Amino acid sequence: MAEVNRIHYELEYTEGISQQMRIPERLKIASGSSEEPPGLLNASHSTMMLVPERIVIAGDDNDARFGRPRDLDLIQSTPLETVELKTPPRVLTLNDQPLDFLEPEPAANSTAQPREEMKSHFRSRREQCRSENSTMRRNGQINKHDFASPSPSRAPVRVCPPLISPEDSQNLNSASGVLNYIKSTTRRAYQQVLEVLDDSQRGRASLVTFDASVENTPDDAGLTDAASLRRQIIKLNRRLQLLEHENKERAKREMVMYSLTVAFWLVNSWIWLRR
């Protein structure tokens, strides 16, 4: 019975709310001095909304109220020219591709023929000089009439002494010996480099009187010394790397042995104290 009364009460409550409550057509914040005409209240909402015929953009010549912005004139006056872009090559070589390959197409087409001719001319001259130098080396001697002054004697090939001595290899058991070994070998290598540079400068000074075609030939003695010195430096670098690796391994072994020794003495002392 109570449930039926509750349902009946809820129905009456909702019916009273729906009959008495209405949504007002207008909301007034404060009453004004002059009341609006009733015709405006009875007007339809569709007649109050007006859609403009056109939308005026700032800068339109037909509308005098808006001035034309300068940015719009600048954008419209600037011609939109197409920019030509070239795909970069995968490999850049000076022989196949000149340094000024980024020039426009007309300039490149106009100067392509002279460049090819100059390249072919330089290539032929280079090959001719190489062939002449090879023939002169095969003969072993150069004709005296081809030079304004007698040719200087070729510098003898100097053999670089070894950087490693047996005395240094015997003192590699300690850290100080390794440091002394590195210092001595570095000093010897530096002295050999200075000697090679001095010899090359002397050879260049003696070749000043040669002809321009012979000046371009490489110095065999300097090349041999540089190659031997480079090999010795590479060997020294490898030896130093091996020494560093051995020192690291020795340090690890010493650390393990030291920790084991300390642990052994600690265990023995603990056992002795327990007794």
From Swiss-Prot:
Keyword Coiled coil in annotation: yes
Alphabetic keyword roster: Coiled coil, Membrane, Mitochondrion, Mitochondrion outer membrane, Peroxisome, Transmembrane, Transmembrane helix
Location of this chain's protein in the cell: Mitochondrion outer membrane; Peroxisome
Cytoplasmic side: 1-255
Ranges of compositional bias, category Polar residues: 131-142
Membrane-topology descriptor: Single-pass type IV membrane protein
Main subcellular location: mitochondrion
Record's keyword annotation contains Lipid metabolism: no
InterPro entries, per the entry: Mff-like_dom (IPR039433), Mff/Tango-11 (IPR008518)
Pfam families: Miff
Coiled-coil region: 223-253
Annotated region (Disordered), positions in chain: 100-171
Bias kind Basic and acidic residues: ranges: 114-130
Disulfide bond residue pairs: none
Gene Ontology CC: mitochondrial outer membrane; peroxisome
Molecular function GO terms recorded: protein homodimerization activity
Domain of life: Eukaryota
Extracellular side: 274-275
Gene Ontology biological-process annotations: mitochondrial fission; positive regulation of mitochondrial fission; protein targeting to mitochondrion
Residues annotated as transmembrane: 256-273
Function according to Swiss-Prot or TrEMBL: Plays a role in mitochondrial and peroxisomal fission. Promotes the recruitment and association of the fission mediator dynamin-related protein 1 (DNM1L) to the mitochondrial surface.
Family membership noted in the UniProt record: Belongs to the Tango11 family.
Protein name per its UniProtKB record: Mitochondrial fission factor homolog A
Organism in which the protein naturally occurs: Danio rerio (Zebrafish)
